[in-house]
């Protein structure tokens, strides 16, 4: 890599199933990985020898299911007892354990049992994306804009930001995926002049968002947003997997539910079939020796696939109705409906959406897999002063808080301070008071959600305002000040007005969050793992080099023409050096140095023998 630090910021779409990275150097470029793929699987695998990330991890998933981790985005910022975590846990082959209420992955790595938080797994994927960018740019990358689903709550946003910190990135901004996609769309040819309402329909591998934007002369104003942080292509695959699992059981009497390897192989076949069914109406599924030596061969039609997922497909229209209602915009006033996310390639999803908008032509001008990273790279260029084009120079993003924020009041009633769809950054205030005479302390539990009953919303954290002067109930004036920054992350302050006493909480230290010490520890661990990966790669390279050199010398020694030209005694010396080199190769844990020494030793003997011919 060339010296120096990249002055801009890369844009990373950290996806549930696949991630994508883009950079802006005079224009946006989506960067392909070492396999030439423009999207990289969000998979991390652990083996007795090494750690694999991306394509290499996904490719060996069937052989090593218990130690191949994916879907970290479905865990990040969630509690272990979260309903969706418990449901997903039944389908994941890797082990999930409860550590102080937080979900943690347990794997076997380098011969030891190791545990990793979802933030650490996500940071490994982010590190991979950073390395892909560095290989292309030729400079060290330090800054990034990372995207999250618009419907991510405060905990999920902060945890994603923490993952960026663990990977050694300075996360300049967390931006919403549909908003990033809207930038990619808005910067398309000749689109930036006219004022219009654009609905972004973003259905990915694991999450679903709908955002309604008003775009006018470079100003992107999000009017409303809705979605489901647990709906996407993975769920469609799961429904197909269940269907075929039952079919295989009927055909063979074998239940593969407990076999992680068979399930992974069948899931991969389902994912492939799902993609194929977007362009043809029928496809076959073939898995050799799926279980107990039984092959599985079957077919599925597009209609059957649609039937298996009909309720999920229908559920995607609810957030569409919600955003129109919240923004008070009738569907006839939507100028464009833009498709984002790989799952929008499904014909049924497109048809339902088009029908909802009275047969409207859907906008497919942007690549659904790459649009989010594209928009993030543009935002990165703007934030680092690297954007040079006329289009991006005046670009302004006005996003919203996806869920209401407030405090718990007496009787567990939710007192909203920041209503959902409020433009961020924002500062909102609301006054409260005491409920008992001479009450000196008031607890402020901070919640996020839309339910009247606090228990049905997400508790983000709590703090106490102490030393309130003794007064009658209802007399003190307590002001709660909610500040939401451009990342959608919250800071709350409470002030007792007569004394000016205050207490505050940045929700980053709430339940299930990482402290700065924990992040620092994870950063150091990440560097150790990276060093271990590099050491393993060097050792692997040294072994391969020695193996190929040994093979070429063996060929020369056994070739009658070449060996006849060797000086008497030289052949014996070469054969002896060859057996020493082979002995080094047979030592499983031979160090890189030992392998290099063996290669140098063999070369010395060969060179001497050849030169004295």
UniProtKB/Swiss-Prot annotation:
Major location category of this protein: cytoplasm
Q: Where's the motif Nuclear export signal?
A: 574-582
Q: Which domain of life is it from?
A: Eukaryota
Region annotation (Substrate binding domain (SBD)) maps to: 403-613
Q: Does the keyword Membrane apply?
A: no
Question: Where is the region Lid domain (SBDalpha)?
Answer: 516-612
Keywords assigned by UniProt, alphabetized: ATP-binding, Chaperone, Cytoplasm, Hydrolase, Nucleotide-binding, Protein biosynthesis
Query: What residue spans carry the region label Inter-domain linker?
Result: 392-402
Q: Which GO terms describe its cellular component?
A: cytoplasm
Q: What does this protein do?
A: Ribosome-bound, Hsp70-type chaperone that assists in the cotranslational folding of newly synthesized proteins in the cytosol. Stimulates folding by interacting with nascent chains, binding to short, largely hydrophobic sequences exposed by unfolded proteins, thereby stabilizing longer, more slowly translated, and aggregation-prone nascent polypeptides and domains that cannot fold stably until fully synthesized. The Hsp70-protein substrate interaction depends on ATP-binding and on allosteric regulation between the NBD and the SBD.
Q: What is this protein called?
A: Ribosome-associated molecular chaperone SSB1
What organism does this protein naturally occur in? Answer: Zygosaccharomyces rouxii (strain ATCC 2623 / CBS 732 / NBRC 1130 / NCYC 568 / NRRL Y-229)
Its lineage opens with: Eukaryota, Fungi, Dikarya, Ascomycota, Saccharomycotina
